[in-house]
Amino acid sequence: MSEAHLPPTGSVEVVPEQTAVDLVEDVAREAEDPGIRTEPLLIALDIDGTIILEDETFSPGVVEAVAHAHRAGHEVMLATGRSWEGTEEFLASLNIAPEFVVTSNGAIILRKSDADVLAYERFHTETFDPIEVLTLLREHLPDAKYMVELADGRRLYTEHLGDWNLEHADRVPFEQLSSMPVCRIVVVSPGDTEQDFVELVERIGLNEVSYAVGWTAWLDIAPQGVDKGTALERVRSWLGIDPARVLVIGDGRNDVGMFRWALENGGRAVAMEQGPQEVRDAAGEVTTSVQAGGVAEVLRSL
């Protein structure tokens, strides 16, 4: 890349959009002082609605901003409700290889297994017996689509859904979903709204598990007491990072747990502007929307 060049003071130079982007990145990179070392942060980023848009392209500026944070010595990782199969590609695209990755809303923590390649292994898993929850939900949502994730990463599902990544997944009868302990249950009911799901879980009570309602009619259920925050506390401890040196960014109800964890420890919790009000209320700060590059804005300020 060519050396950053600014036009003389008082003049205006019109350049192509990509040239402008490259110029901003060059100037930002040159402004970084490698002689100034700060204590590293543990930065945990949600994926959907935080670093990527609905079409799974990256939020503006996020790739460059993650690189900026990495150059500053911070540990940038992902904490997502996705399975590992739906997460791996984003590590490669961001060009990061953190020591740990939190998936399945905290029920599975993966650890890097090879220093030279992007290879990870399941390091810690949480499971529960799904039979009571599945039976209860089926009574109220007989037409919903169900999927469970097992401790070894395999997934079992009842019906295909277009936006599900079904690598390492098998279609089975509903009764087979509860044949062994699971890390999580995913329920999708296209005929219901997000508010319908919120009201349903309040009405029937899901007291023996943790759960989060997605921005569509999507219910994600994990073992009791397990969320992104509990998983990140394990990661923080393993890495030996000060509890106050954490920064988490997300947009959904499944991010509230890690928001609370960060704030209770004196860290930072940042919600995306387009998230539900209850999510923004749970965070200590609100950045701009994913469409406007909210994550990049936060990371560039470090």
Task: List the model feature ranges, each with a label.
Residues 1-47, 71:
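Non-catalytic pre-domain segments flanking phosphatase-related domains
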Residues 16, 33-34, 38, 42, ...:
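Mg2+-dependent phosphoryl-transfer enzymes with acidic/Ser/Thr/Gly-rich catalytic loops
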Residues 49, 82, 250-252:
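Active-site metal-binding loops of divalent metal-dependent hydrolases
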Residues 60-162:
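Active-site phosphate-binding/coordination module
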Residues 62, 87-91, 197, 201, ...:
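Hydrophobic packing residues within well-ordered alpha-helices of enzyme cores
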Residues 73-77, 97-99, 184, 244-246, ...:
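Short active-site oxyanion
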Residues 94-97, 105, 204-207, 264-265, ...:
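Short, structured coil segments at secondary-structure junctions
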Residues 140-249, 253-260:
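Conserved acidic, metal-coordinating active-site core of Asp-based
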